[in-house]
Amino acid sequence: MFDKLEDLIHHYEELMNLLSEPDVANDANRFKKLMKEQSDLAPIVETYKKYKECKQNIEDSLAILDEESDEEMRELAKEELKDSKEQVEELEKKLKILLLPKDPNDDKNVIVEIRAGAGGEEAALFAAEIYRMYVHYAENRGWKVETLDADETGIGGMKSVEFMVKGSGAYSILKYESGVHRVQRVPETESQGRIQTSTCSVAVMPEAEDVDVKIDDKDIRIDVMRASGNGGQCVNTTDSAVRLTHYPTGIVIYSQTEKSQIQNKEKAFALLRTKLYDMELQKKQDAEAEERRSQIGTGDRAEKIRTYNFPQGRVTDHRINLTLYKLDKILNGDIQEIIDACIAADQAKKLSNMEHDA
C-alpha cells in the first residue's frame, strides 16, 4: 500500500507542475481533465502526509524516551506517543478507504425512477411522498431536479415518476436508495384503524452519455402526439409529446413535460440511453455478485431495503440495521444520516472483500 502511496504523491507533484504550465492552462479540455485528477488525488495525498508526520512523531517520542532523563519531558513524550499512535491507526484506516477502487459512475448525474407497488392508491400516495423526499434532499444540497415523466392520480398520488438529479457526485450518494421502500400506516379511508402495508420501488441510474451507449437509428421507432393530462385531457394543441420504442429491448419511453417536441425528444433519448446503460451495469453487477457468492458465500441483495412506520414515527433501513425515530424529518428530505451509514457499511464490506481476496 505504501509503495502505491509514494507513487501517487510523485504523480500528484507532476500534475501540480503541469497545471502551472502556460500550454496546459491554454488548453481548456486538458486543464479541466488534469484539475479533476488533481482534486481526486488531493485527499489521499493530504491524508498520507499527515500519516507520515504522525509516524515521525512516534520516532521522535521514542527517541526522547530512550535518551531523556527529565521526568517532565518523558511525560510529554509519552502523551505525544499515545496521541500519534491513535492518529496513525485512524489515518491508516482512512487511507485504505481512500484507496478503494472508485465507481466510474460516481461523478455522474442520476435518473431516478419511482413506481408504486402493492397497495393501490395508498402505494401511489407513498410513491409521491418518496418523490418529494428526494426533491427536498436534492434542493437542500443545491442540486437541480428535472421531472422527465409522471403518471399522477387524481388525489395527489403517483403511479410512477421519472426525474433527473443534476449535481456533483449525485450517483455516489443516491445509488444507495435503489430498492423497495415499504410504508406502514392507517389510511385516511380506513374506518377500523387497521394498519396497511404498501410499497414503492426506487431505481437510481447513472445518466448515460453518448459515449456510454450507442443507439442504432434502425432500432428506434419515434411517435409524436399531443400531450395529455389526467384522465386523458388534452393539454397541448401541438404534437409535442414523444414516444420512443426500442425494438431490441422492448423499452418504451414517453416524454411530454416540455412544450417543445425537440426538448421532449432530447429528454426521451436521455432516459432511453440511461436505461440501456443501466441494463448493462446490472448484467455486470449480477455476474460479479455471482462470482463473489461462489468465493465467500455472500452477495444476496434483499428486495426490501427500508420501512417507514407512521404509528411509531420510525424509519428502519434493513440493510444496515439502522432505526431512526424522525419519520417527518426524513420524509422532508433529512436522509443524510441514512446515506452516510450506507456509505460506511459499503466501504467496510469492500475493505473486507479486498482483505479476503488478498
Swiss-Prot record:
Keywords: Cytoplasm, Methylation, Protein biosynthesis. InterPro entries: PCRF (IPR005139), Pep_chain_release_fac_I (IPR000352), Pep_chain_release_fac_I_sf (IPR045853), Prokaryotic/Mito_RF (IPR050057), RF-1 (IPR004373). Methylated by PrmC. Methylation increases the termination efficiency of RF1. Disulfide bonds: none annotated. One of its GO terms (cellular component) is cytoplasm. PROSITE patterns: RF_PROK_I. It is found in: Cytoplasm. PANTHER family: LD18447P. Belongs to the prokaryotic/mitochondrial release factor family. This is Peptide chain release factor 1. It comes from Agathobacter rectalis (strain ATCC 33656 / DSM 3377 / JCM 17463 / KCTC 5835 / VPI 0990) (Eubacterium rectale). The lineage of its organism: Bacteria, Bacillati, Bacillota, Clostridia, Lachnospirales. The gene is prfA.
